[in-house]
Amino acid sequence: MAKKSLIYREKKRQKLEQKYHLIRRSSKKEISQIPSLSEKWKIHGKLQSPPRNSAPTRLHRRCFSTGRPRANYRDFGLSGHILREMVHACLLPGATRSSW
């Protein structure tokens, strides 16, 4: 299980990303439309003004049950070992174990 502080930190990053999403998108759109390099630099400076944690690249997908940040499956929202345990216990409908 991940530490509670790390999970809360990730939730805080998600809220910041949602808050500054429109500002980032509008700034990127302006940069693509303006041909002048000097004006692009000004807008780029404005793009750097939001907090670092509001960038979407700083977000991590976490396991729904344990909060583990690695080896997550998007379809289920679970980490690999929890997914395996749940499939073996037949708790995930439609998931089958492979055998060959």
Curated annotation (Swiss-Prot):
Key word Acetylation present: no
Localization of this protein: Plastid, Chloroplast
Keyword Ribosomal protein in record: yes
GO cellular component labels: chloroplast; small ribosomal subunit
Keywords from the UniProt entry: Chloroplast, Plastid, Ribonucleoprotein, Ribosomal protein, RNA-binding, rRNA-binding
GO BP terms: translation
InterPro entries, A to Z: Ribosomal_uS14, Ribosomal_uS14_bac/plastid, Ribosomal_uS14_CS
Superkingdom assignment: Eukaryota
UniProt-listed Pfam families: Ribosomal_S14
GO molecular function: rRNA binding; structural constituent of ribosome
Entry-linked NCBIfam families: PRK08881.1
Entry's family note: Belongs to the universal ribosomal protein uS14 family.
Function according to Swiss-Prot or TrEMBL: Binds 16S rRNA, required for the assembly of 30S particles.
HAMAP family hit by this protein: Ribosomal_uS14_1 (MF_00537)
Subunit details: Part of the 30S ribosomal subunit.
Protein name: Small ribosomal subunit protein uS14c
Highest classification ranks of the organism: Eukaryota, Viridiplantae, Streptophyta, Embryophyta, Tracheophyta
